[in-house]
Amino acid sequence: MPNPDHNRDKLLATCILGGVAAVGLTIYLARCHRRGSPSGRPVRVYMDGCFDMMHYGHCNALRQARALGDQLVVGVVSDAEIIANKGPPVTPLNERMIMVRAVKWVDEVIPDAPYAITEEFMRKLFDEYKIDFIIHGDDPCVLPDGTDAYALAKKAGRYKQIKRTEGVSSTDIVGRMLLCVRERSVSDVQNHSTLQRQFSTGRSPKFDDVVSDSRTKISQFLPTSRRIVQFSNEKSPGPDARVVYIDGAFDLFHAGHVETLRIARGLGDFLLVGIHTDQSVSAKRGVHRPIMSLHERSLSVLACRYVDEVIIGAPWEVSRDMITTFNISLVVHGTTAENTDFQKEQNNPYAVPISMGIFKVLESPLDITTTTLIRRIVANHEAYQKRNEKKAASEKKYYEGKTRTSYNCPYRTSMYSETHSFIV
């Protein structure tokens, strides 16, 4: 008897051959390879990481890992392990757990995972969590003693490798913020407020040098329609669906954003998120903002399980025409946000939904904003500067040694090869 899942997957690949065939075909082939667990149960794959300053590159890695199995279990490294191996994390474990749990490709999360997979922890993964394969990117993960953090998994023949997402890393994001503070001392309390003001206004003694440095990145993010399709949901609101709309910059997408989106999603059937343009954010919050570009911010929001659709480059003001076009039932805004004084603005961006009686202010569960993260960097920027210098060297080595990645199907090589990198 034919497998109905097989026919469904094949139909998915066939239906979109005239448009974005690579996405559907990749999903189909990945599913073909991940089937066939000896016990007949779902294939469970494991990926771990620090997930500090979580970004769309992390999310894309989790998406690729999930495509190699039926269930994705994610280990989040403890604060103590990160400090011992890399330096202080910007976001503590509780915030990193919120971020990882919110990624729509994640099925289960293990807190306080070790930085290196020990024999004991590997056995726990295989026996207790029923993990079939351990996944990691093709960028090296080297311990302080120079050994491979995944050596045991490779030796056991249970290791699979995916391609890292180029153009972004936590090191790069922290580096973007450090550009404004690299020549300042944080020993003087007075300097803290000065640095924060400079971050908002863009004024610094050597601003021209800072701008020049920001153009010399090792790798640059190049958005493609294929990546957006991979992150998008294949759903639209029904005719009677209650559509909830929330907008913002969503810069340095963090736990505060996630928790607000979770509450917003609970108020309706479909959550539509508007992502403001780079120009709008800069005009309202200073020339150094946003830290992440419009497409980078959009991908981070799209990866969130509470989000159904995004408007890439949403208008600052919510108009009546926009409400009608998207059939919006409710417009919401959090109490903890960068622009909480919007009602004092000459042109209140929410004037129309307020007049229509469809506007609601949400009590934000967490007192975290993008500025909160920037202040953490500013307060301890010397430690992050040292960490970045060390990490940047390894990233440079990775990019110098990388080989061309083809868009052709990567599944001709056996899935059970330890060295093959899967691109999905």
Regions picked out by a protein language model, each given a short descriptive name:
Residues P2-V424:
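Nucleotidyltransferase catalytic core that binds NTPs
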